[in-house]
Curated annotation (Swiss-Prot):
Its cofactor is Mn(2+). Residues 1-7 are cytoplasmic. The lineage of its organism: Eukaryota, Metazoa, Chordata, Craniata, Vertebrata. The gene is MFNG. Keywords: Developmental protein, Disulfide bond, Glycoprotein, Glycosyltransferase, Golgi apparatus, Manganese, Membrane, Metal-binding, Signal-anchor, Transferase, Transmembrane, Transmembrane helix. It comes from Pan troglodytes. Mn(2+) binds at D144, H256. Pfam families: Fringe. This is Beta-1,3-N-acetylglucosaminyltransferase manic fringe. The active site is at D232.
Length: 321
């Protein structure tokens, strides 16, 4: 009896020890640290935040001759709503513009001529400034365009983040052709679509970084000279012929080369860009009633701005119309 008691006690102690070890292992497996490491219980990684207007770089191309005639109109209207996102690229210093725009006025060393090299020089400056900004989208417009920031943001948000995007309005109903120089004095005929710069276009950063070998620094002008085409065509050439990308055509961009009167008033708030000018000898503007007369507002941009932003201080109040 005295010999069995220690054996029974030892067995009981051994059983308790095993149970204690199992319990300890169980609690270790359920510790907060282990729960966080369990794949099934991990929180999903949040994706990039939704695109905001401050993620977009808007470049306006102009020249000294249009500083007063065109730019002041833009500064009074849509640029007043996108001042932090908008950069104006010109060929000559302007004290008045400098006071209004500060560092957002970029004076290039480009010629004031309306030639392929001069236009490509300014586009190269726009592209390089965008790359240095770190922003998510590059949008180019001319100084006769009205940009609707709400419609622009709605359009850009619709594109998948993981895709290369080149969106704008082609000016032709067919691809353009170019002769691409080859070794041994040969040439190769290539064809591609491009978005006309006169209506504006946008490129996301993912695509812009891939374009850098042909578009950054002096290489954009070199590429333009190689195919003997202007800046907007060169953009399309790089994207489609060098990178295998594709233009996403959008009817929401407009230039003065189309019949703008065909747009109904109800459609205007949906358009990303609008324009004005003389086409085939006639004034080509959107059809929009008031609040300013055609004599007061020949471009109709001020009336359009009041339609989109009736709270603008210089817009006539609703009760006074």
């Amino acid at each position: 009896m005295q010999c069995r008691l220690p054996r029974g006690l030892a067995g009981a102690l051994l059983t308790l020890l095993c149970m204690g070890l199992l319990c300890l292992r169980y609690h270790l497996n359920l510790s907060p640290q282990r729960v966080q490491e369990t794949p099934e219980l991990r929180q999903p990684n949040p994706g990039p935040p939704e695109l905001q207007l401050h993620d977009v770089f808007i470049a306006v191309k102009t020249t000294r001759a249009f500083h007063r005639l065109r730019l002041e109109l833009l500064l009074d209207t849509w640029v007043s709503r996108t001042r932090e996102q908008t950069f104006v690229f010109t060929d000559s210093p302007d004290k008045g513009l400098q006071e209004r725009l500060g560092s957002h006025l970029v004076v290039t060393n480009c010629s004031a001529e309306h030639s392929h090299p001069a236009l490509s020089c300014k586009m190269a400056a726009e592209f390089d400034t965008f790359l240095a900004s770190g922003l998510r989208w590059f949008c180019h417009v001319d100084d006769d365009n009205y940009v609707n920031p709400r419609a622009l943001l709605q359009l850009l948000r619709a594109f998948p983040l993981a895709h290369d995007v080149y969106v704008g309005r082609p000016s032709l109903n067919r691809p353009i052709h170019a002769s691409e120089p080859q070794p041994h004095n040969r040439t190769r005929l290539v064809q591609f679509w491009f978005a006309t710069g006169g209506a504006g276009f946008c490129i996301n950063r993912r695509l812009a970084l891939k374009m850098a070998p042909w578009a950054s620094g002096s290489r954009f002008m070199d590429t333009s000279a190689l195919i003997r085409l202007p800046d907007d065509c060169t953009m399309g050439y790089i994207i489609e012929c060098k990178l295998g990308g594709r233009l996403q055509p959008s009817p929401l961009f407009h230039s003065h080369l189309e019949t703008l009167q065909l747009l109904r008033t109800a459609q205007l708030p949906e358009q990303v860009t609008l324009s004005y000018g003389v086409f085939e000898g006639k004034l080509n503007v959107i059809k929009l009633q008031g609040p300013f007369s055609p004599e007061e507002d020949p471009s109709r941009f001020r009336s359009l701005h009041c339609l989109l932003y009736p709270d603008t201080p210089w817009c006539p109040q609703l009760g006074a119309r």
